[in-house]
Amino acid sequence: AVKEGKIKLKDRDIVAVTEAVVAKSQGNFATVDDIAKDVREKMGEGTVGVIFPILSRNRFSNILKGIARGCDNLIIQLSYPFDEVGNPLVSIDKLYEKGVTNFNKTYTEKQFYKLVGKIEHPFTGLDYIDVYKKICGENCRIILSNDPTTILKYTKKVISADIHSRHRNKDLLLKRGAKKVITLDEILNHSINGSGYNEEFGVLGSNLSTDEKLKLFPRDTKTFVKQLQKRLCEVSGVKMECMVYGDGAFKDPVGGIWELADPVVSPAYTSGLTGTPNEIKLKYVADNQIGDLKGKAAEEAIKEIINKKSKNLKNQNVSLGTTPRRYTDLLGSLADLTSGSGDKGTPIVLITGYFNNYADE
């Protein structure tokens, strides 16, 4: 692609590789039965609670299927009106119409249906209460509550199925009397009968592969990015930065869904991508620090301000509006938006000139 496009590579250009390519090249797959066996070994007999799962067939249906097979009885506690990343179980407008303006009450499945009537996801049309109950079969009941400790009224053994708040909820449940709590990163964090696994993230970041199989988040990614950087340097003579990326960290302004269903945007990256930008706001500088200068004089004045800027602009007026986010979160989101989630066929993204600024010649 570089040769055909006559692209001139430079130091600090970035090669981003989607996690799916890495995971598939590793053969990092597992089955629903692998999950069931691991859950049974870790949770034992009796009733198990599952709190705050994401509302997604791609992300959670096979995980739930495996959990259900590994448990005698299951109680699923859903948050409402949204899951953790903003997927709506039911329209918030519908709840407002029913007079529900705060969400601190606990409902049984029957009570919730009586309150809202038909449940329908605004985009897919699915009723996720029905979807998840059908996946689990007869040994399942569903409650709705936004308090993670509600589940302890039903069982003291809990799987915290949330993604980004899992550690906080696990700690809270244990402090409030839970006997056993695991999170999704503790399921398949080792191989079961030769299955794939991820020692750091377990089944977090996994995707549905077939009705009985999941593709797991890739492992050994730190080694992969270092080897890729070394090989690219040998071939091109340029020291590029490399990263593996999954979901971007952006929020859909129409649907209100935060797209980050993976545990992290980037599980591994080379050292040059560590840190956050340290930038000044050009609009602020232009309005406040260059006076009546115009044209070339204004341009040179702004470049001088950039070149002399402090190494830490935190809480300084010149940095207003430049919220510092990690390079890997920004770049991974850029790569994910570029590659898309469907049939673009762009599993590798080249990003050039990202670290340039206005003062660079």
Report each predicted region and the residues it spans.
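Conserved mixed alpha/beta catalytic, RNA-binding, or beta-rich assembly cores of soluble enzyme
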Residues: 1-11, 20-361
